[in-house]
């Protein structure tokens, strides 16, 4: 059950570098995920909340409520909305920082805790336990519903503009980004960071992005690493060909020297130049497709 998940996510944590003290701290994520909620090392980007309204909120969902992190400009209104979809490690400090980066660009950014019902991954010390007890038990249908609820809440409670809705996600959230673009017909655009494109279907997670190409309405920009050991380039090229054959306006960019999680500045897989280029491409994609002026 675990094999289909472990390669890209865990390999990107461990890497193959010589272990300095900082790198030992980074790789300890494999046995203690509490570290993922705090900045690690000089490469970690920290975005302040000056001029922002930022913090934890509660989102009403179909069966109650779930926690989320929300960041938006402190002044103004009618903000474009971006749903920020977590990595497998939940809504930790890196994901919150990404929300603040978007807020500095004028967005209302929301990262809902999509594992809230299944467990708190920051308190689980073993990665196999995370996959077995949490990730594998999160239904795609529930995730789609929660993202819809987060978007609706942003409109109602955070001055969000329902006509300018975007989504972006990383790793586990990259796959979700593609699926959400096939789910929500009101979505303006999406950016999927190294989300798995093909995989073994399960009852709770029945489809992968390659399976839903025909249903993708919103333009999605896929950002992938040419050295990703968990997402074969053959899969990336197959997805690109399928999008073209279906006459979709989505695009895929491959960074030749990057591996999995090249945007994650708290992990040894981080590549500053590719991360910066990917971020610029993400913002430009949203501008191009009318999320922001």
How would you describe each model-predicted region?
Residues 1-19:
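N-terminal secretory signal peptides
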Residues 249-293:
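C-terminal catalytic histidine-bearing segment of alpha/beta-hydrolase fold enzymes
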Residues 43-74:
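N-terminal cap/lid segment of alpha/beta-hydrolase-fold proteins
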């Amino acid at each position: 059950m675990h094999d289909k998940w472990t390669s890209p996510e865990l390999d990107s944590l461990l890497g193959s570098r010589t272990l300095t003290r900082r790198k030992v701290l980074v790789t300890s994520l494999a046995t203690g995920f509490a570290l993922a909620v705090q900045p690690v090392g000089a490469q970690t980007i920290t975005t302040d909340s000056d001029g922002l309204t930022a913090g934890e909120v509660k989102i009403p969902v179909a069966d109650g409520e779930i926690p989320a992190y929300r960041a938006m400009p402190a002044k103004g209104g009618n903000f474009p909305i971006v749903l920020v979809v977590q990595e497998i490690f939940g809504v930790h400090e890196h994901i919150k920082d990404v929300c603040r980066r978007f807020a500095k660009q004028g967005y209302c950014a929301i990262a809902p805790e999509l594992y809230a019902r299944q467990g708190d991954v920051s308190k689980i010390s073993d990665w196999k336990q995370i996959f077995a007890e949490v990730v594998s038990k999160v239904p795609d249908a529930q995730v789609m519903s929660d993202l819809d609820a987060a978007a609706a809440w942003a409109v109602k409670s955070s001055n969000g503009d329902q006509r300018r809705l975007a989504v972006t996600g990383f790793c586990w959230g990259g796959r979700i980004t593609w699926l959400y673009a096939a789910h929500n017909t009101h979505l303006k655009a999406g950016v999927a960071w190294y989300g798995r494109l093909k995989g073994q279907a399960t009852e709770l997670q029945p489809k992968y992005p390659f399976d839903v190409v025909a249903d993708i309405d919103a333009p999605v920009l896929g950002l992938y690493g040419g050295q990703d050991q968990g997402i074969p380039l053959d899969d990336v090229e197959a997805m690109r060909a399928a999008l073209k054959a279906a006459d979709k306006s989505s695009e895929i960019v491959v960074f030749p020297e990057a591996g999995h999680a090249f945007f994650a500045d708290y992990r040894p897989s981080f590549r500053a130049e590719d991360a910066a280029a990917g971020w610029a491409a993400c913002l430009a994609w949203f501008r191009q497709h009318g999320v922001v002026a």
